[in-house]
């Protein structure tokens, strides 16, 4: 059933979270701190900018914005 729902492209302003299974196997994970905060995997973060295959994400916390590859980012769906 979910296969029939078209996937919306991520864009500026989209609410997102990081897919832990994809991130853990990436080159970026190997080059970064192994103890990442859980909020990046729970979301939501907001996409501020997209450049080629990377997106700059801002979290609703007093922390710096972070760049992630688009394939590591999933849309955050707000449950009503």
Swiss-Prot record:
GO terms for molecular function: oxidoreductase activity, acting on NAD(P)H, quinone or similar compound as acceptor; quinone binding. It is found in: Cellular thylakoid membrane. The keyword Membrane applies. Its EC number is 7.1.1.-. Keywords: Membrane, NAD, NADP, Plastoquinone, Quinone, Thylakoid, Translocase, Transport. InterPro entries: NdhO. It is a peripheral membrane protein. The keyword NAD applies. GO terms for cellular component: plasma membrane-derived thylakoid membrane. Belongs to the complex I NdhO subunit family. NDH-1 can be composed of about 15 different subunits; different subcomplexes with different compositions have been identified which probably have different functions. HAMAP family: NDH1_NDH1O. NDH-1 shuttles electrons from an unknown electron donor, via FMN and iron-sulfur (Fe-S) centers, to quinones in the respiratory and/or the photosynthetic chain. The immediate electron acceptor for the enzyme in this species is believed to be plastoquinone. Couples the redox reaction to proton translocation, and thus conserves the redox energy in a proton gradient. Cyanobacterial NDH-1 also plays a role in inorganic carbon-concentration. This is NAD(P)H-quinone oxidoreductase subunit O. It comes from Prochlorococcus marinus subsp. pastoris (strain CCMP1986 / NIES-2087 / MED4).
């Amino acid at each position: 059933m979910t296969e029939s729902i078209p996937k919306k492209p991520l864009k500026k302003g989209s609410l997102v979270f990081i897919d832990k299974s994809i991130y853990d196997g990436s080159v970026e994970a190997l080059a970064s701190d192994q103890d990442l905060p859980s909020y990046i995997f729970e979301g939501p973060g907001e996409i501020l900018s997209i450049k080629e295959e990377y997106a700059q994400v801002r979290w609703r916390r007093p922390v710096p914005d972070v760049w992630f590859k688009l394939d590591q980012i999933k849309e955050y769906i707000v449950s009503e």
